């Protein structure tokens, strides 16, 4: 019986030995509960009855303490398997530290080009970086972050198993749904509509995702000035960073052939707030526009003509939302600084996209082309039909394309005609078979409880023909360039981080935009992504190891941590020796 390790039904280790050791490890290497001060206590038991038998263990199992203890969940087993796979993958790629065998090297793998090409271009097939990727290089430990980037698939799977990550996603989603309920309503309508009409939506996933992002961004930003409550969430933006010098690109170019050395940086802004510039009150319907019988184009023309007046009284604040597991802001300054920089990038991008509408139009097209999309290809007609049925502003706007009329955007109007055609004539068949009336979601007014209205496919029969101007991504890029020009001119120099615990916004940090700080950070991050420098691990102090490494997946295999902790131990011994010798003199 002595020397055996027993596991009770709750997964706790029980050591039936004559001496009870209350330090962090038992003699055979298995972990047991530590005492508060991590001392070792030997409790001699000469009585053989002190050895636990099966009956004793059964009694322990039935103690009240164990009644509230859950057995190990299956997800923990899955998490452990994924972690083992990730560590093996990183070790295989980075290799062992030649100076410290069995521990992972802390320099980039030789024979590979650089993280941007290794991870983004070759592994993920994405010719772009994200704001998050630039900001997370230094927010914690750069070494850990790049280990994770190089094992991205496994790292993401592990993250998705973590409760706090799931909780954070739910909070972001609930805020988006509260501000923009039309998204879920559209998805529900589309699902039912396709089932009833037996239509299919054959559209490439990348095209579908980009189209949804562009459509929603236009709609939400227009709504910010009309019927919205002064808020818009989950808005896409992008900019460029130079591959050679690591500088953010300040001036847009019209041709992708001139920007090959520039890498796209994409981002999604959590929250925009339209407020009065003088009293900081949130502005609802600041443009005072009646949207009935209006179109995107009419509203944008009105906003552009009144931009000077709008700018004199209003501003838009960019916010980033951070979720917390406790109602406290992060105690580590680098984490807060990373969030600030993330918001500064968004501010820079909106400034970049509000310089000139023609250049912004081409910038969005370059973005689409870098994703491998054909900007001249007609968009799936079924997708467009669902937009027409659910969004009157869009439906009224695309009549210009139907009849071959200009949309009052010079770059698009000179660029729109092509050899491709856009034909919705096949939808005439819907009028002779199956249902023709459907309930579609509508924007709710404060004095109305109606969330849907009935529409008839027959009311949209004029669209079911060959259009004179093809509906392509170029149309959406044109409308994006107009609304981003408007919003970019209103963006405030005051930026904000919003901290949420559950659904409670318990703290905000407001801070100024800092061009110099942003430029320095962009260059330093670009250098590591594009191979200009190696990874920078954390400064090797015991405080840092206790703070940064405590929950790191790589803490047991990290050579940087292991080697420097041993140095600190040796240093401690040397200091102790020096003190002892000096005291004896």
Curated annotation (Swiss-Prot):
- What are its cofactors? Mg(2+); [4Fe-4S] cluster
Q: Name one GO cellular component term.
A: nucleus
What residue range does the UniProt record give for the transit peptide? Answer: 1-26
Write down the InterPro entries for this protein, in alphabetical order: Exo5, EXOV
Primary localisation category: mitochondrion
**Locations listed in the record:** Mitochondrion
Q: Name one Pfam family in it.
A: Exo5
CC cofactor note? Binds 1 [4Fe-4S] cluster.
Q: What is its EC number?
A: 3.1.-.-
Q: Where is the signal peptide?
A: none
From what superkingdom does this record's organism come? Eukaryota
Enumerate the GO terms in the molecular function aspect: 4 iron, 4 sulfur cluster binding; DNA binding; metal ion binding; single-stranded DNA 5'-3' DNA exonuclease activity
GO biological-process terms attached to the record: interstrand cross-link repair; mitochondrial genome maintenance
Q: Where does [4Fe-4S] cluster bind?
A: 141, 549, 552, 558
Enumerate the UniProt keywords alphabetically.
4Fe-4S, DNA-binding, Exonuclease, Hydrolase, Iron, Iron-sulfur, Magnesium, Metal-binding, Mitochondrion, Nuclease, Transit peptide
Partners and quaternary state? Monomer.
Role this protein plays = Single strand DNA specific 5' exonuclease involved in mitochondrial DNA replication and recombination. Releases dinucleotides as main products of catalysis. Has the capacity to slide across 5'double-stranded DNA or 5'RNA sequences and resumes cutting two nucleotides downstream of the double-stranded-to-single-stranded junction or RNA-to-DNA junction, respectively.
- Entry's PANTHER family? EXONUCLEASE V
Family, per entry: Belongs to the EXO5 family.
Q: What is this protein called?
A: Exonuclease V, mitochondrial
Q: Which organism is it from?
A: Saccharomyces cerevisiae (strain YJM789)
Upper lineage ranks? Eukaryota, Fungi, Dikarya, Ascomycota, Saccharomycotina
